[in-house]
A protein has these predicted regions:
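Active-site-proximal substrate-binding core of FAD-dependent oxidoreductases
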Residues: 270-273, 301-340
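Beta1-alpha1 glycine-rich phosphate/pyrophosphate-binding loop at the start
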Residues: 2-3, 7-64, 143, 148-149, ...
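A conserved FAD-binding loop/helix module that cradles the flavin
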Residues: 280-315
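Local cysteine-cluster metal-coordination motifs and their immediate loop/turn environment
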Residues: 344-358, 371-389
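Residue-level detector of alpha-helix initiation sites
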Residues: 15-16, 40, 112, 152-154, ...
Length: 419
């Protein structure tokens, strides 16, 4: 691997948005480099694995990427630092090196929001998307009793994956009200593909106005306590998968000076956040793969100067932004979910920091100094979203190294010319 590399266009993330961006930009002849920490393109939604059923659309996009001679892809690669303007230090399993670029598109996606509740650290409790990823990677669930709880369509998708591999779904607990879910369903004919998909994912164990209260068990999960439409019930289960929506992955954007709006990267009509720096997909807000694909294509066209091609995609983007708005309104989290944790409920699993140790602090910095919350191995990737939701604390921009790195990789910084 060369100690340095140059890209006319550097794309971070090879999910739907990153793939669409690369393919939109490729006809320009620009030298395009894609980085992703997964082995194959597709992101979380099209994650590959021994038990994965990758959609035809994803396979076609992979084939088109493979056919483009001006797209170079680095799999299993992480961004470590930004040592200078338009320059990143990156690392894979074999080496670390510097990449300089002219234009950058961030397609860093989103991660699950996990809210703490009693028992959530028991073995057998995972994220809803996490369970789906584990099953695709080969986790056997044949005959296991599964409860899925939280909010949003990901619950149904996770349940469908589990059922396909032999799990027994005991309950799908959706915290949104029946009125909100029915109102969302009534709008789905505006997006026929989503309307048909909703029929294929429907499950008779689905309940609205239902949320988790506690995971039950001693050494591992044995059951779950739910508040179901005003009543408290308990179900025996072998697995509990919870997901309370998605949080945009904005940390790298923050470090590179991108504008932030709410919890997402802020972009203009061309998907630009600052000069020569673009973003697309769920790092700019959750809206599904269709919105990510069109945003990625707009960013790709705009980054290589084909503004007319980008402009022609604006109506399609607006259509899927309408879907995203309806989705986010229908599945907005009930404020009572903020009170699930008890004083002794762990919030930061890495540093064993309970909820009671965080109440009374005014911001992240104060809480870290007092408790080390968010300073463990995951660097706040799990507890950070929960703390922001529970207390409203805004995370500060990450400091390098952004991911754990080898000493040899950090030594590449010696090759950085002085600013």
């Amino acid at each position: 691997m060369p100690m340095n590399e140059y890209a006319d266009l550097l794309i971070i993330g090879a999910g739907p948005a990153g793939m669409a961006a690369a393919l939109a930009a490729a006809p320009s002849g620009a030298r395009i480099v894609m980085l992703d920490d997964n082995p194959l393109p597709g992101g979380q939604i099209w994650r590959d694995g021994p038990q994965a059923n990758v959609p035809d659309q994803a396979r076609r996009l992979r084939e088109r990427l493979q056919a483009c001679s001006n797209i170079r892809r680095h799999a299993g690669t992480r961004v470590i630092a930004s040592p200078g303007p338009k320059q990143l230090l990156v690392e894979n399993d074999d080496a670390g090196w510097l990449i300089s670029y002219d234009k950058l598109i961030l397609c860093t996606g989103a991660r699950e929001l996990l809210l703490p509740f009693p028992g959530w650290t028991l073995p057998g409790v995972t994220g809803a998307g996490g369970l789906q990823a584990l099953i695709k990677a080969g986790l056997p669930v044949q005959g296991e009793r599964v409860v899925i709880a939280g909010s949003g369509p990901l619950l149904l998708a996770s349940a469908a994956t589990a059922k396909k591999h032999g799990a027994q779904i005991q309950r799908i607990a959706e915290q949104a009200s029946r009125t909100a879910v029915a109102g969302f369903a009534a709008q789905l004919p505006r997006w026929p593909g989503k309307w048909l998909q909703s029929f294929s994912l429907f499950d008779r164990h689905y309940r609205t106005a239902t949320h988790v209260l506690a995971a039950l068990g001693t050494d591992r999960l044995e059951g779950v306590r739910l508040q179901q439409q005003g009543k408290i019930i308990e179900l025996e289960c072998d697995r509990l998968a919870c997901g309370f929506g998605l949080i945009p992955n904005i940390q790298l954007g923050q470090a590179l000076g991108y504008a932030i709006e709410g919890q997402a990267l802020a972009v203009d009509a061309w998907q630009a956040s600052r000069v020569d720096h673009y973003a697309a997909g769920e790092c700019t807000g959750f809206g599904g793969s269709e919105l990510a694909l069109v945003e990625g294509a707009i960013a790709g066209h705009a980054a290589v100067g084909d503004l007319e091609a980008a402009r022609q995609l604006w109506p399609r983007r607006a259509r899927w932004q309408g879907f995203a708005k309806a989705l986010n309104q229908a599945f907005a989290l009930d404020p009572q979910l903020k009170s699930l944790a008890r004083p002794d409920t762990l919030v930061c699993r890495c540093e064993d920091v309970p909820y009671g140790a965080l109440t009374g602090h005014t911001d992240w910095r104060e809480a870290k100094l007092a408790s080390r919350c968010g300073m463990g191995a995951c660097q706040g990737r799990v507890c950070g979203g929960a703390v922001q939701h529970l207390f409203g604390w805004q995370p500060s921009a990450p400091r390098p190294p952004f991911s754990p790195a080898r000493i040899e990789t950090l030594m590449c910084l010696d090759d950085t010319p002085p600013a």
